[in-house]
């Protein structure tokens, strides 16, 4: 039965990729075999059309639960990437001059279409990325919330005025779009992260070049089709595909004014440096090592549930996964119960009923996670729960790692210093809250952290002293809702303006200030003033 389900799921994905992205060649049909020459190809989206790439370089898309090839995505050619930017540049003046109310209406229609197609988008995510269907729906929903927030643009883009700054003179400023903006998205949130980017940028009047992860392009392609159906003019949103060459193209192209990136530290540092060197605004959300500090007065049952869910959900492939627990004082005694609770999680393919977590994205990701677990044992830590040898019936070729808990971890160990990005929770122990705060602050990352306590003074002390951009109090994954901004800090972020919220609007716009004087009478002096104007002195 499992094999039948796998085949059906793969067939469904092939059919949807074809339906969404092969508009230019309606005679092409998916073949019944899985050979690399017959699986559906993901198209480019340029000037409002889904176009077959002329590239001779193609990347296989795999179902992480089976490692079967379910699609192929091109590495866009230089000419194709140039055409995409040219389309953005050509359509920018008209889109920027479009009434903000009209742009708002496009986004209002878009959020409704996302709601209507949420389950279909989630299924694409599940097949390409490996998430459970429930988690994939959450991926889409959190992106949808940003789209809904973007619909408030008429309030978010209000300017400032100061009348009568001096006699007959007024001062006012307003926000204008930048031009062509670009986004580079990761594999772990195929819907949410693109929806952090292009809706916010485009409602401000920018046009947008999107490069989804080559591992999970399906959701972005469907989101682009829905955006077009919402009334967005052709050419305002364009999509290219690729790897290193596409990234360099985005960083270097003179017509691209701003870059949004989410992904690894290595890639983020590179993009920030190269893009900034070419005069672009860059915002880069990067790696993390998120700590959950457990105080002995915490609500025990709630805390254990929160730790397990935040550590192992999405197989740990979240930049806000709670990958590190610090047990303070008597909370150390809860460790056996934490292990027992994690053992109950069900590992399976994402579409299987009752699955709590699915596979990792690639065999290479699985190997890396297993090697980091190995490093813990070699460096003196203890493995209390080992998920390396897990086998999922019917999905023996999948990239599965079960929940893993490593105790007796020290800050100098590799499994602590590295971002694992898998279903692994490393556990440290301290005697005091101050020791826990020092551990968190000595770590270079600053994405998120959480404290579990019933003491308000303890929570306040931790929130104020910890050097992390996003703090949860009895909230394990403190990702802000989009009326606020995603405020990772230190080594987890590069740039000076964060994603979505008010800062998202600031990133995608520039200020223009007008100083205006309308005199009722003609000048009483016959000679010009050559000293610095003081305006109101």
Curated annotation (Swiss-Prot):
One GO CC term on file: mitochondrion
The protein's enzyme class: oxidoreductase
Alphabetical list of CDD domains matching this protein: ALDH_F6_MMSDH
Keyword Transit peptide: yes
Catalytic residues as annotated in Swiss-Prot or TrEMBL: 319
Protein's name according to its UniProt entry: Methylmalonate-semialdehyde/malonate-semialdehyde dehydrogenase [acylating], mitochondrial
UniProtKB keywords: Acetylation, Mitochondrion, NAD, Oxidoreductase, Phosphoprotein, Transit peptide
EC number: 1.2.1.27
Role according to the record: Malonate and methylmalonate semialdehyde dehydrogenase involved in the catabolism of valine, thymine, and compounds catabolized by way of beta-alanine, including uracil and cytidine.
Organism, as annotated: Bos taurus
Residues recorded with modification N6-acetyllysine: 49, 54, 57, 78, 89, 119, 131, 300, 332-333, 366, 378, 502
Quaternary structure, from the entry: Homodimer.
Keyword Transit peptide assigned: yes
Protein origin, superkingdom: Eukaryota
Post-translational modification as stated in the protein's UniProt record: The N-terminus is blocked.
Annotated localization: Mitochondrion
Catalyzed chemical reaction(s): 2-methyl-3-oxopropanoate + NAD(+) + CoA + H2O = propanoyl-CoA + hydrogencarbonate + NADH + H(+); 3-oxopropanoate + NAD(+) + CoA + H2O = hydrogencarbonate + acetyl-CoA + NADH + H(+); (R)-2-methyl-3-oxopropanoate + NAD(+) + CoA + H2O = propanoyl-CoA + hydrogencarbonate + NADH + H(+); (S)-2-methyl-3-oxopropanoate + NAD(+) + CoA + H2O = propanoyl-CoA + hydrogencarbonate + NADH + H(+)
One Pfam family matching this protein: Aldedh
Transit peptide segment: 1-34
């Amino acid at each position: 039965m499992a094999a039948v389900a796998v085949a059906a799921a793969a067939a469904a994905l092939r059919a949807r990729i074809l339906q969404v992205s092969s508009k230019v060649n309606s005679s092409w049909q998916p073949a019944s075999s899985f050979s690399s020459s017959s699986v559906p190809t993901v198209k480019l989206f340029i000037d409002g059309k889904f176009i077959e790439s002329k590239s001779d370089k193609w990347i296989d898309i795999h179902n992480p639960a089976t490692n079967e090839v379910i699609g192929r995505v091109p590495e866009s050619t230089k000419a194709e990437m140039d055409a995409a930017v040219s389309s953005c540049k050509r359509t920018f003046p008209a889109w920027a001059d479009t009434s903000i109310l009209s742009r708002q209406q496009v986004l209002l229609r878009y959020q409704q279409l996302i709601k209507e197609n949420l389950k279909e988008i989630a299924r694409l995510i599940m097949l390409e990325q490996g998430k459970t269907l429930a988690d994939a729906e959450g991926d889409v929903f959190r992106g949808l919330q940003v789209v809904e927030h973007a619909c408030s643009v008429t309030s978010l883009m209000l300017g400032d005025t100061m009348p009568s700054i001096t006699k007959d003179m007024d001062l006012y400023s307003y926000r204008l779009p930048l031009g062509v903006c670009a986004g580079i998205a990761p594999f772990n949130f195929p819907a949410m992260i693109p929806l952090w980017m292009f809706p916010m940028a485009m409602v401000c009047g920018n046009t947008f070049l999107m490069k989804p992860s080559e591992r999970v392009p399906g959701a972005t392609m469907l989101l682009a089709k829905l955006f077009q159906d919402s009334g967005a003019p052709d050419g305002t949103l364009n999509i290219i595909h690729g790897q290193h060459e596409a990234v360099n193209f985005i960083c270097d192209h003179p017509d691209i004014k701003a870059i949004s990136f989410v992904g690894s530290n290595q890639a983020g540092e590179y993009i920030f440096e190269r893009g900034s060197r070419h005069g672009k605004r860059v915002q880069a959300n990067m790696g993390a090592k998120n700590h959950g500090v457990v105080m002995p007065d915490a609500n025990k049952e709630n805390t254990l549930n929160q730790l397990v869910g935040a550590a192992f959900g999405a197989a740990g492939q979240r930049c806000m996964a709670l990958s590190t627990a610090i047990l303070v004082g008597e909370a150390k005694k809860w460790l056996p119960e934490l292990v027992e609770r994690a053992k109950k999680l069900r590992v399976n393919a994402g579409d299987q009923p009752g699955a709590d977590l699915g596979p990792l994205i690639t065999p290479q990701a699985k190997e890396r996670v297993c090697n980091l677990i190995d490093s813990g044992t070699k460096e003196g830590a203890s493995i209390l729960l080992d998920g390396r040898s897990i086998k999922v019936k019917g999905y023996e070729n999948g990239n599965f790692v079960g929940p893993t808990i490593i105790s007796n971890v020290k800050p100098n160990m590799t499994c602590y210093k590295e971002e694992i990005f898998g279903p692994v929770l490393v556990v440290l122990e301290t005697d005091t809250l101050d020791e826990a705060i020092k551990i968190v602050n000595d770590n270079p990352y600053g994405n998120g952290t959480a404290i579990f306590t019933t003491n308000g003074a303890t929570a306040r002390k931790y929130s104020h002293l910890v050097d992390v951009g996003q703090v949860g109090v009895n909230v394990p994954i403190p990702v802000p809702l989009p009326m606020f901004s995603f405020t990772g800090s230190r080594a987890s972020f590069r740039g000076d303006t964060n994603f979505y919220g008010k800062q998202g609007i600031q990133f995608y716009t520039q200020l223009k200030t007008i100083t205006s004087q309308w005199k009722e009478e003609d000048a009483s002096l016959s000679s010009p003033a050559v000293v610095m104007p003081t305006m109101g002195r």
